[in-house]
């Protein structure tokens, strides 16, 4: 990676290690740029949804439909993958807290490996 400044945190859990990296753009614009093997560019703010999905056409639209059906507005989106057709990480910044039933609906989809809401 080519960052002037990069902070990386490694957390050890019972399920293994997780690595998260962040940086500052233009000296005052914080960004998350890596989670494990996925690279992306996401603003760490407000309510966020992190999920890993199959990397194939139509997935983003299906997620948007689920969010829209539950009146959750997507403000920003960032995606990262390491190979075409494999798995992709998507980070959504949303305008409000995501109801638990939305997460349950997403996790019930066969193309979603995992999904977590983060509120900062």
Positions of predicted regions on the chain:
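A conserved regulatory-domain signal marking ACT and ACT-like small-molecule sensing domains
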Residues: 1-120
């Amino acid at each position: 990676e080519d960052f002037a400044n990069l902070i990386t945190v490694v957390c050890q859990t019972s399920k293994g290690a997780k690595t998260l990296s962040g940086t500052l753009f233009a000296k005052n614009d914080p960004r998350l740029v890596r989670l494990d093997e996925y690279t992306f560019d996401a603003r760490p703010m407000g309510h966020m949804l992190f999920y890993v999905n199959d990397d194939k056409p139509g997935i983003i639209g299906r997620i948007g439909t689920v969010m829209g059906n539950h009146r959750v507005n997507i403000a920003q989106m960032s995606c990262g993958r390491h190979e075409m057709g494999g798995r992709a990480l998507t980070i959504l910044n949303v305008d409000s807290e995501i109801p638990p039933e939305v997460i349950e609906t997403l996790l019930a989809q066969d193309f979603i490996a995992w999904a977590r809401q983060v509120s900062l």
